[in-house]
A protein has these predicted regions:
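A short, Lys/Arg-rich alpha-helix, primarily the initiator
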Residues: 1-22
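Short, charged recognition helix plus adjacent turn
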Residues: 2-6, 31, 65, 72-77
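Helix-turn-helix DNA-binding elements, focusing on the entry/boundary residues of the two helices
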Residues: 15, 26, 42, 57-60
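Residues in the recognition helix of alpha-helical DNA-binding motifs
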Residues: 18, 32, 48, 77
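Residue-level detection of the helix-turn-helix DNA-binding "recognition helix"
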Residues: 20, 34-35, 50, 61
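Short alpha-helical DNA-recognition segment
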Residues: 23-47
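DNA major-groove recognition helix of helix-turn-helix/homeodomain DNA-binding modules
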Residues: 52, 56-73
């Protein structure tokens, strides 16, 4: 099994938290990310949320945009 970092796991937890706060499914979030120009499937969203896939700076930018949050919100403990 691939090792993950605390930051990767933290981002996954926050993505799931904000997705659920918005009442979205993983499929809903994937669709919104695609509209924003970031091609992530539901499966990739699931891997990010479970901490098994790192996110790029571009993807982080798009999560912030789609959720309508700040970078501080995403990285806050």
């Amino acid at each position: 099994m691939k090792r993950t970092t605390p930051l990767t796991r933290h981002i996954g937890v926050k993505v799931r938290e904000y997705r659920l706060k918005n009442g979205w499914t993983q499929t809903d979030l994937a669709a919104r990310m695609q509209v924003a120009g970031c091609d992530l499937s539901r499966e990739i969203i699931a891997r990010i949320e479970s901490g098994f896939r790192q996110t790029s700076v571009f993807e982080i930018d798009k999560f912030v945009e789609v959720f309508g949050i700040t970078y501080n919100d995403l990285f806050a403990q």
